[in-house]
Amino acid sequence: MSYLGVGLSPVNVAGTKMKLMDRKVRLTELILRCSVCALALVAAILIATDTQVKEIFTIQKKAKYTDMKALVFLVVVNGIAAAYSLLHMVRCVVGMMKGSVLFSKPLAWAIFSGDQAIAYLTVAGVAAAAQSAAFAKLGEPELQWMKICTIYGKFCNQVGEGIATALLASIGMVLISSISAFALFRLYGGNKAQQGSRW
């Protein structure tokens, strides 16, 4: 028994461990959301500001991200992911300040669904942009598509940096969606444990 007259019991210890784990999960989620917001914003800026002008036979041709629809999609998706992460960063900070650690099931479902949608969008954006970048770098001789990166080297390098940054943001979103899945299905796990203990 402690000096306050409150004895230690398995329930008290389990509750303390659960609160500590909840705090760590929330902090991890906040750090990941901050990282995704920053990385997605950097990726969108890198690609959207990328241009290069080359003179080919006295004709100036300007390469810009809007020339490849996959890059436009990647910029839009990263902008959405950055805004979504910023919104949830605020939710995480408010939740940590209030000290509320448990969600209602509808809110947990909404967060889980949103995180899944953004994770899928970011992965799709990176995949589409990587495929287009591979065509630009390697060309496609069967279709007589030439290698663009031999002409626009700086443009291709900056696009590559943007795609790599977007890949890191999409990995972060996949990790966040795993955390939201854990938070959602944990709400259902408690009921099963209580029902099982009745037997």
UniProtKB/Swiss-Prot annotation:
GO terms for cellular component: plasma membrane
Subcellular location: Cell membrane
Keywords (A to Z) from UniProt: Cell membrane, Membrane, Transmembrane, Transmembrane helix
Entry membrane topology: Multi-pass membrane protein
Predominant localisation class: membrane
One Pfam family it belongs to: CASP_dom
Record family assignment: Belongs to the Casparian strip membrane proteins (CASP) family.
Subunit structure: Homodimer and heterodimers.
Protein name: CASP-like protein 2B1
Species whose genome carries this gene: Eutrema halophilum
Phylogenetic classification of the source organism: Eukaryota, Viridiplantae, Streptophyta, Embryophyta, Tracheophyta
